[in-house]
């Protein structure tokens, strides 16, 4: 019976994929309930690698390759002893590590090291067809560099211990050797500071330090909309304004706004809608200006209408970010549960969707860093991690200082079912939920959420215990404690979701709920939809 259940779920899930892109948030230490800095990243893609590895420290003097496109089909399970850069990876350069590197968590976009430096990225697009983008297109076509986002984040995590060090490192590499790829917005945090870094193309980049009481958001469009001369809180490529004038990217009139000069015109709902939703959801001085004004999700002047960042009235928790990332525009005119694509049971994980939300079915993984600067490095380097759509996944604690990850982290491909893969384990729950999402999401929450709440408290207690052990000279024992605890939690979730996928599929067999009738989520609205479609057929 188990094989039959899994076969059905695999077919449903593979058929439900489509293309999208990432959402990131960053929160300063004075805006969080526990005094940590936070970053988050929903890695939304049809094709990204689902495996997660620990990359160990490399000794000083080790040669490091600079690889472009080194992800598809690559295997970093034995790196650096075995260098497998996959089917598309090309080594463009190499350098010698002048000092021992940091251990870090390697993913499609690597995200935290054992110093507690954390990252998240959002690939930024612009209006390629617009006339005003013509100078940018011409400039981009002539700009070739060797650093793509995958490699730059890997190298920054290997070499930097603080957010400022990471910004300096990334900026120097782009200045010296150039950027390879679409523009990117990268949030970087270390428990004390948060920086927002944007790479545009060629040798152009800039970054600013987020105020400690602020919340930053980005949904696939460049956002740094102001300019300062280099200072303690703002950094940029040398001669950035002069370059923009010389190339015709800027005419010298008005404010110099990097996001508009180098990546202008991305005003699609797919991006602006997600930004608007954050301002609606988290109360701040800006909320009254946007709440109830659904038309602002199509705003064509977002850099003027929306703030670059804001101070939330209530302190942010890991759960706050998880809820935002699970959002489907509920309660607005863009409510995904009321889309005809969602069917009678409000399946927001259907494809296609009418309005692109933050929560999407093709999310590869979802991570929230939660770095507390007052803890020792070994105990502070915490990230909450889960595979799949944020609304249906769990979050399990991972420490970049661990000696090993649970086995299901490093196996599997989305193209072939693997019962030992963490991604497939969650994907089956997600897919079963699409059979009756309105009911399934409540079942998932009832099982998951109490465990998550208890896990937050238990994890902080474990961190404090590890900190005491390190203070008493028991560093190795503390790392063993963190490893044992984190892997126990990961295995607990893996087993729980293995059972949950079968329970959900059995619950919705033959289109019912435990063999009882299942009413539509929005009964009257759904009747209108069906009637309208029926009328068209006539």
Annotate each language-model stretch with its function.
Residues 1-4:
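Positively charged n-region of N-terminal signal peptides that target proteins for export
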Residues 7-16:
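Bacterial N-terminal signal peptides
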Residues 22-149, 169-308:
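A contiguous strand-loop segment
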Residues 153-159:
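Short, well-ordered beta-strand elements within core beta-sheets of diverse protein domains
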Residues 159-167:
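Short, charged, surface-exposed loops that flank catalytic or proteolytic processing sites
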Residues 245-374, 378-382:
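Glycine-rich, aromatic-lined ligand/substrate-binding cores of catalytic
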Residues 339-471:
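Substrate-recognition/cap regions that form aromatic- and gly/pro-loop-enriched pockets
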Residues 448-538:
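Histidine-centered catalytic/metal-binding microenvironments
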